Amino acid sequence: MDNKEFALQEHEKWAGKIEVISRAKLETPEDLAVCYTPGVAEPCIKISEDVNLSYKYTRRHNMVAVVTDGSAVLGLGDIGPEAGMPVMEGKCCLFKAFGDVDAFPLCVRTKDVDEIVKTVSLLAGSFGGVNLEDISAPRCFEIEHKLKECCDIPIFHDDQHGTAIVVLAGIINALKVTGKKKEDCRVVVNGAGSAGVAITKLLLTYGFPHITMCDINGIISKDSPDLNWMQKEMTKVTNLEGRIGLLADALKGADIFVGVSAPNIVTPEMVASMNQDAILFAMANPVPEIMPDLAKAAGAKVVGTGRSDFPNQVNNVVAFPGIFKG
């Protein structure tokens, strides 16, 4: 049985990866009277007097909504909210296993920015935080911004910030292995969606001055056509040398490659054209931009992917549970 068949078999066996288990003991009529009516009225009254007491008398303090519209799921693209549900359930499992955070999937049947914002804001009183997941750019930037303005709980777009955090952490350690200095490194970020933009912003903030972004059409510059508003903003702080061309041109002489894009788009020849002891984070899922063995054979010093079955996994699972746990 291959891995794909095994994954389907296990998901069919689980019939869902999460469930709700009662924290309250319900063994006697007295237990029932405290957990539900009439005893439940007392915390209701207290919360009605001070809504912040919902964090004390309910599980809200530990509950996170994992929200998607299914428009940018893994490397699969726009597959819809129902098809995104297995990923959201898996995300909730990771929240619980690694942060003891209770997370619930909310897969919404709309791609309208304002409808998503309204839906989440109306549900915000049930949760202590919101994790936005697998929403396509540039709508994800608008949704996050608007929710932060109208909600009084933390709003976190993991595809942006969680990914950026683990990429920076991995690069910091890769620099130690290679002896490279951030000030001298040329960085290429391939993928100009939510993850690529957030990664670039964080690397710039940390002090990497030489970053070139690429998309499906190649190097992004101020003269590139068909850029969205966020990508246009990024041209003001990246590719300051005014490079033009394709991804292969961007990688010539580069020290670091960060891929959040598409499978099998980096060739061994491209890796060989990079500087000595190159660092490659090929994080397209489920198939990376280049397989680790090919990258290493072509001369890369440090290679990471987003997959747990390869060494050096660069995946936001090592960040978001702890971020929400606090």
Locate each region found by the language model.
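General beta-strand structural signal in soluble alpha/beta enzymes
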Residues: 105, 131-134, 155-158, 189, ...
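Glycine-rich phosphate/diphosphate-binding loop of Rossmann-like nucleotide-binding domains
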Residues: 74, 79-99, 157, 161, ...
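Solvent-exposed alpha-helices and their adjacent loops that cap or buttress functional pockets
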Residues: 12, 55-60, 96-97, 122-124, ...
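A short helix->loop->beta-strand "cap" motif at the edges of active sites that frequently abuts
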Residues: 152-153, 208, 275-279, 300-301
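N-terminal ligand-binding/catalytic initiation module
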Residues: 1-153
